[in-house]
Amino acid sequence: MMKHHYLFLKLAMLALAMQLTANTEVQAQDVQVQTMHEELENGITQTLWIENGARRIFGELFTPQQPRKESSIAIIAHGFNGTHEYGRHYHETLGRLGYSCYALDFPCGSVRSRSDSNTLNMSIIDEVSDLKAVVRHFRSQGFRHVVVIGESQGGLVSALTAADLKQDVSQLVLVYPALCIPDNWRKHYPRLEDIRDVTELWGVKMGRRFFEEIHDMKPLDIIGQYRGPVLIVQGDKDQVVSMDDSRRAQQLYAPGTRLHVIPGAAHGFRPDELKQEMEQLETFLKKE
């Protein structure tokens, strides 16, 4: 029990460190769009709020100076206790390829979320709903090619989202996806009655609902419903996410799914390892 608790603690810690750098009617907020940073060489960044029913989702939209002929966007889903800032790693590569990029803050997904920082209401189910809302929003705005990129817990959310939105997600990228989260917590809390009202991980307080909703969830029985192109990137020294899960996911997805293993990389990439990820991403996107 403690072993699995420790693994998830590591997931929380590493995701936090890396972040330094339903069918719902979806509509755009009467959005206040403003430049957040200095104009980049290959594009600009702006704030964009998207609504999912009563939920308001904050995000940062990067628009390249030279967009692709076919309107294309990558949507970035951060990991546990992360934020939209994770998406900035992708601006250079995506801008060079002519892709827009939208990185969101999952409501209740982080103590630093600009959408909603009340992590007691964190929920995988809600994050899937929010990501689906974002995908549908950009589809409604005329983007014909939508790529979803998810890291760690965001990888789990992205995989579940793509399984539901088979026709709307053009390509899927999973970066050390934490498909193990339900199984880890099921072992820590074998019975529903074992779940505490509040579970705290590295200062992040999570409510019962998070654990109740995933108690019987089996992602590997679901994610293969998505049959589009998939890229999985993971390090062979990852002590949080089992390489076996990623290998099995590769087999569950359509033929041609690529699992790129970065030698020596753990759960969270150093700059040289991040460069490898971007090289793989560029090759993957150029195929379509």
What role is predicted for each listed range?
Residues L165-G207:
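Hydrolase active-site cap/lid region
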Residues A265-K275:
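Catalytic histidine-centered segment of alpha/beta-hydrolase-like enzymes
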Residues Y226, I232-Q234, D238:
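Short beta-strand/loop motif that positions the catalytic acidic residue
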Residues L94-R114:
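Conserved alpha/beta-hydrolase
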Residues S110-F143:
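Catalytic nucleophile-loop/oxyanion-hole region of alpha/beta-hydrolase
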Residues G228, S242-Q251:
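Short alpha-helix in the alpha/beta-hydrolase fold that links the catalytic acid
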Residues D30-Q66:
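N-terminal cap/lid segment of alpha/beta-hydrolase-fold proteins
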Residues F80-E92:
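The serine-hydrolase catalytic nucleophile loop
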